[in-house]
Amino acid sequence: RGYAGRVAGGVFKPGDEVTVLPSGFSTRVKAIHSPDGELSEAFAPQSVCLTLTDEIDISRGDTLVKANNPPMVNQNIEAMICWFSPRPMLRSTKWIVRHTMRETQAIIKEVKYHVDINTLHKIEGVDDFHMNDIGRITLRTAVPLIYDSYRRNRTTGSLILIDPHTHETVAAGMIV
């Protein structure tokens, strides 16, 4: 049985020990396949099909990671966001967070600060966001996210916030 997906970072080779997150099951890569045939390695941003040495349950949105290079797994996520929506942010809203292939609900637990785009100074004590505001927040997600900082990996370190009523993208974020 093969598992198809896109490599977000690093290099995978047959024989590599990998861990499935969030389950924590470990196995080894048996073979790597692409539309062009079998590969000796896979790297970002290739789309590949991995066969593993053990039959384990892997679901859509699960993440395969090298055993010696685990990402962070947490429900409290700090991010720098840019607010896109003409409607202001309401702290009481349960937003939809889209991160890699997963979606979950989240609340904005804390607004740490805004950034004055003219001076790049931090403005503390602001509790909401309006169109084009940039700032740092803490999100609390319904389920843990598997992520890296944006500086380390742009794919696993980015997210978007979606309005649960209109399904409009209201903000984009870089995990810090």
Briefly describe each language-model feature range.
Residues 2-176:
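C-terminal effector/interaction modules appended to NTPase cores
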